[in-house]
Every structure is written in C-alpha cells, then in structure tokens.
Amino acid sequence: GRGRMEPYMLECCVDSVESAMEAEKGGADRLELCAALVIGGISPGLALFEEVRKCCGLPVRVLLRPRFGDFLYTEHEFELLRKEVALFREKGADGVVIGCLKKDGSLHMEQMRELIREAGSMKITLHRAFDVCAEPMRVYGQAGELGIDTILTSGQRENCLAGMPLLKELSKLRQRTGGPQIMAGAGVTPDVIRTFLEETDITAYHLSAKKTMDSGMRYRREGVPMGLPSLSEYTIYRTDSRVVAEAKRILTENGTR
C-alpha cells in the first residue's frame, strides 16, 4: 500500500497515429511518441508528432534518440538532440524523453543540463539509458538535481519483473528524498501491473500494449528484408486499446480500494 495516494500514471509508447488513437481509446493517461519501436524507439519526425496532436488529445512526451544503440553521443549526434529538443518545444510537446551517458557509464551531466536548458518549461523523462548506467542510486539523485520528473526504468534488467528488486529500492529512495517518479517499463502487461501493485509502491507504468497484425498486402515478394532479416516485412505492430483498457482497469480498481 502507498502512504501518499499519488495518482496512477499509465503511459503508452506509440510509433504511429493509429497506435496513439488506440492508446487514447483504451484510457492511457499519456503518450510517449517515438519512431521504429521495433528497435526500441528513435526520435519521431515532426509530421508524425503533428498528426498525433491533431488526432489525439493526450499529453505527449517525445522520445529523442538519434540512432539505435548505446547512449554515448558524438558532437554531431548531440547537436541533433539539442535541435530536436528545440523543435519539439516550439511545436508544443508536453515533454521530452532523453538520456546521455559518458564512457564510464555515468550520467553525462553537462549534456543533460544543456538539453534541459533547451527544453524550457517542458517536462523531462530520463529514459532507459538509466538501465545501462553504472551507479543507478547515484544517477537517481543526479536526476533529481537536474529537475527530471520521471525515470523510465526496468530496474536494469531485461524486463521490469526481473528488475523489481532495484525498482523497489528506488521507490523507497524516492519516498525518503522526494526525487523523480519511478515509471516501470519493459515487459509491462496488465498481469505485471497487478503483481507490481501487490508488491511495490510504484504508481507509474509504461507499456506499448502491442498486438501483431498481418500486412494488408496480397502481393508478397518474400525474402527481401529492408533491414533486420529476422523480422517479417509483412507484420505490423500496433497498440491494442483492449490491453490498455485492461491495464487502466487494474489501476483504477486498485486506486478505489
């Protein structure tokens, strides 16, 4: 049980207008908007952001990540991040989801400060760069100093169930220090949320709630992968509003008990 009755937060990670609309229909509280979720998400284009804004009324935090892979950024990559923060601020995003590390696995405080300065009044989430940092408890404190309001994390494991011990520790640290909100992500399902509500004080959850859909193409030239040979080019991933609604129902019921 929780000491303070903090409102629950259900954030849905989406990479299409269709998914954004499904998330809203299911009762998500907020969107994390990205492109190419199939590689863990990279920065979305402005066109996608504007269409999502037009078709969907939910608050939007934009994931900013210039490429697949680690969070050690070259000068040019960092310049892209800085420009994207400015662009999405001008376009009216509610927040950005960012993270930069140094070679030794510490949080790159200078780069983070610069991006946060550029963000102005937008809210800041520290993304799963946190899950590959060297000293999570220290980075949690630093995130608080930077004014970051949310940390998206799996507890430094392949999924948040495996990472629950660290997530519990971080949640306790938050109750002592009033630092950033801990948002559990990676492998979140309605059942996982139920387990977390029984065993932790965590109130924020991040999921893609995705279903696989068959491509509408009747004509199919197989054996011509566009990138990742392990993935079918004729499978489409989309948020399922029913899964979002089930997650929301579990949170709502727990909130009224």
Model segments located where?
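Active-site-adjacent beta->alpha loops and helix N-cap segments on the catalytic face
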Residues: 18, 37-57, 76, 100-120, ...
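Hydrophobic faces of well-ordered beta-strands that scaffold small-molecule active sites
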Residues: 8-12, 31-33, 60-64, 96-98, ...
